[in-house]
Amino acid sequence: MQKIYNHQNVEDGIESKWREKKYFIDHNLDKKPFSILLPPPNVTGKLHLGHALDSYIPDTIIRFKKLSGYDVLWLPGMDHAGIATQSKVESELYKQNKLTRHDLGKEKFLAEVWKWKEIHEKLFRQQWQTLGLALDYSNEAFTLSKEVNEKVIKIFVELYNRGYIYKKNRAVSWDINLQTAISNIEVINKETPQKMYYIKYFFENSSEYLTIATTRVETMLSDVAVIANPKDKRYKNLKIKFLIHPITKKRLPLIFDEYVKIKFGSGLMKLSAHAEADIEIIEKLGLEVIETIDKNGYINAPDYQWHKMERFEAREKMAQFLEENNYLIKAEDSISNVSYSDRSNSVIETLMLPQWFIKMDHFRDLILKNLSSKEKIKFLPNRYKNNLKRWMNNVYDWNISRQLWWGHQIPAWYKDGKMKVQAESPGQGWVQDSDVLDTWFSSGIAAFSFFKWENDDAFFKRYYPSSLMVSGYDLIFFWISRMIFLSLEFTNQRPFKEVFMHGLIRDKDGRKMSKSLNNGIDPIEVVEKYGSDALRWFLITNTAPGMDIRYNQEKIESAWKISNKLYNVALYISSMPDNNLEAKSSKLSEQSKWILNKLSALNKQIQKVFKTYDFSIIGVEIYQFIFTDLSSWYIELIKSLNIKNEAMYVFKKILIMLHPFLPFTSDYLFNKLYNEELLEQSWPKFKRFKDSSEINLLIDAITKIRKYRDDNNISKKEKLYLCLKEKISKKNLNILLSLTNSEYKENKDFLIVLDNNSIFIEISQEQKQKQKQELEKKIAFCQSEITRAQNILSNQSFIAKAPKEKIKLEEDKLQRYKQELQIYLEELKWKY
């Protein structure tokens, strides 16, 4: 071992050793299984801090379970990430070659995407290995592999045959940038500054008008009606029932519907084809849906001057037209919720398109039934179970079709106006649906398809349902819910027994990390600077179920110091003189029994934490054990003792227990000190030793003597002369004198009270006089306070008027000062 800790030297080569020895690939079927599925990262880029957290939590759990005697399986996989990957590749193609996917054609473009996938798949594996993850690479899966594709197609066809999948022209959220429909939960609403336009809609054959407020002037060309709330007194008694459109001059019926908010704008709403709620009302009333904005976000109205104009430009030009023709009353600045694509951050357009949907009523019931059954999934923290229930009770049908090339192509076939849904082509002339499935469809079946469902029954039965799912709380609806209902439908089992929802990682100011804020942190750069153990320690010990984490550089530096401290302890123990004895629990020193009791108590806490996964609780306790119990006390207390065998025995247990939290450091030190492999060991067992009162007394005495030096500005080099009221063993007395730079000398000068003993420290005549004066001041103060309290309590007027609490306070003060006075008088008597 080098004399100075260097995390790069320590961590180098260890992960490759774990893989070579197949610690997490070879499975002992005689042991109880424990399985976890790694949330598959998208093959779109590289690892970010969220991935690191998603990885370190299950890795820590897997290592604990392995050492505790389980056959562990941590199954890795990657997600083809349809929209995200295709848009990345398209962007790169255009940046490098000025080519679009249409220039290449589907076959060549998909070949480029597969190349991208291969490159980033390798990059992810390298990064997993840098983090030191205990993954079973021999069972790695991919959501667009041949095996998974076969299962996706089978499940789609089966769901269709069961009546749970349908195709229909419906209002969908269309991403203009990505050129695909997206599901409702991929839409985010943002408060956005925009103009609210107040427009005149004149009554038919009248100079009177109604005022309609809208932020979306560009949708006016698709207006088919004006609606008001039937409870709105301003409009319910109107006799004229038609209005003339200010631009198209069409007759628009005035219709009443409770959807309209009376207090929003003028209380009137124009019905157009570019809002989901509007379309629902239009269809309910049997009116025509007239779309005037196309898939590219351009106006599609050949009869009007704004035809082929970009939608937001058209908004301004149409508002200008209305103003010039005296139809615009005013335009006010306003803040309103606007729907954006969570994928591309572009403003969503609502379009009527033929799309594939999953009916959610049946699957809602499946989830709700499971959550109240004996085989229910346990949520940690439990509040996310309630969140899921609320969401499922308000769930929309799931739009599962995407207008992409990269993904699982929908197994629907068309010919002569007919449609068939099946895995293989029905024959010549049949054309397959060009849409692909939403990425979350294949991710949703990963919970069982990755565990070799219908491919390897023995493997599936052993490891499914998985023991635990670890995920960020932001995926509960996107992914967790879909895994649950698809697993219940096709395996008749829950996908996992427990699900642990962790928080998100934010920057030091609590902001979400994003490219736009330029506040992202590359975990690999952190690992290079501080080591994987330091980053792991920071992320793990700041993880409380469901709570966000703020990135903190200082805490990572502090985490590095933990490994550094352990390294230095190992250096010291290895340098101790050999005594060639075997450590036996029956013959251990008091010091070793004391530290083992401390370790036993820590073990109980660690065992509890691995049931709740609230790792934020254990971090402080482990830190205190390493820096205080182990380094500050145990190592100090054994320096004068020839017990290397015991120190090695103790430290071996410590390293095994710390392995889940500091795998690289613990593995390296274990191998160097014991020439054995840590991952071939078992979790230590403990017997409780009788508490060593002398060791506790020793620590108490040393602590208080050091404080005495600090309080009196006495140099550590200056020798103290002291004695103890009660005798302790010669061995422990020598340790006390050595660690406090003292000599034993009978005296009764300065008293330090311990729990079960007392120390007297000799002081000079000058110090004695000064201390006597201080003591006399304390006596005088107590006497003064006693007199004051007695006078107040003997005052009948005070007793009659004062609140009981105030009287009680004075009585307590009187009692306390009497007790203190007695102590000070006794001290004055026997000291001076």
UniProtKB/Swiss-Prot annotation:
A single cellular component GO annotation: cytosol
Family statement: Belongs to the class-I aminoacyl-tRNA synthetase family. ValS type 1 subfamily.
Name of the protein in its database record: Valine--tRNA ligase
Record Gene3D superfamilies: HUPs (3.40.50.620), Isoleucyl-tRNA Synthetase, Domain 1 (1.10.730.10), Valyl-tRNA synthetase, C-terminal domain (1.10.287.380)
Motif ('KMSKS' region): 512-516
Described purpose of this protein according to its UniProt entry: Catalyzes the attachment of valine to tRNA(Val). As ValRS can inadvertently accommodate and process structurally similar amino acids such as threonine, to avoid such errors, it has a 'posttransfer' editing activity that hydrolyzes mischarged Thr-tRNA(Val) in a tRNA-dependent manner.
Location(s), subcellular: Cytoplasm
Pfam families noted in UniProt: Anticodon_1, tRNA-synt_1, Val_tRNA-synt_C
GO function term, MF aspect, one: valine-tRNA ligase activity
Binding-site residues, ATP: K515
Domain of life: Bacteria
Extent of motif 'HIGH' region: 41-51
EC number: 6.1.1.9
Coiled coil ranges: 760-831
UniProt-listed SUPFAM superfamilies: Anticodon-binding domain of a subclass of class I aminoacyl-tRNA synthetases, Nucleotidylyl transferase, tRNA-binding arm, ValRS/IleRS/LeuRS editing domain
Organism: Mycoplasmopsis synoviae (strain 53) (Mycoplasma synoviae)
Quaternary organization: Monomer.
Keywords: Aminoacyl-tRNA synthetase, ATP-binding, Coiled coil, Cytoplasm, Ligase, Nucleotide-binding, Protein biosynthesis
Keyword field contains Nucleotide-binding: yes
Cysteines paired by S-S bonds: none
Record remark on domains: ValRS has two distinct active sites: one for aminoacylation and one for editing. The misactivated threonine is translocated from the active site to the editing site.
UniProt gene name: valS
Major site of localization recorded for this protein: cytoplasm
